[in-house]
Amino acid sequence: TDVKVPVENRVGEEGKGWTYAKGLLEHERTGLAGLSRSLVALEQLKGNAESITRGNGTLMDDSGYKAKIAELEIDLMATEYTELRSLASASAGEELGPESSILKLKGTEIQQRIQKLTVEASGVFASAWGDKPVGPYFSKGGMAGYLNSRYYTIYGGASEVQRDVIAKNVLGLTRSKTK
């Protein structure tokens, strides 16, 4: 509170720093959702699963794996529609709001689920390390990708923070104060 910043070095109006920071975070979170990357990755995953033989069919013939892919597609489509509504609002000059938290939360969780299903499709080959691929070509770096995806839900505001934003701004809930 005792910081002195020369007027010529200020960005925007005095006392509005947090408002500007929140606006930047909303845009950052929308981008971190990575929905276009997830759409491409999911299509690649489905193609890869079609190339893996399991029993008398492919991995995509496995009802359990197919159900996981279907759930992921549904979540991705619903999140994409949220993004499109958000973009339409922004195009109309409206501010982004808690939608950016929803997009960041759902988008990064979807990215993690894609990585997890890639590891599942790769089987033991996902753990292979080094420059020489072992097993299916897409399994190279599978486990590393999965483990690195853990931080997706941390940067740009941890998932717990996003849930708090959603609870407060969408659902009107407040945190109970325990003594």
Which sequence ranges carry the predicted segments?
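Tryptophan-centric aromatic hotspots in well-structured domains and transmembrane helices
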Residues: W18-Y20, N48, Y81-L84, G107, ...
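Short, well-ordered loop/turn and helix-capping segments at boundaries between secondary-structure elements
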Residues: V5-P6, E26-H27, S51, L84, ...
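Hydrophobic alpha-helical scaffolding
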Residues: V11, G31, L35, L59, ...
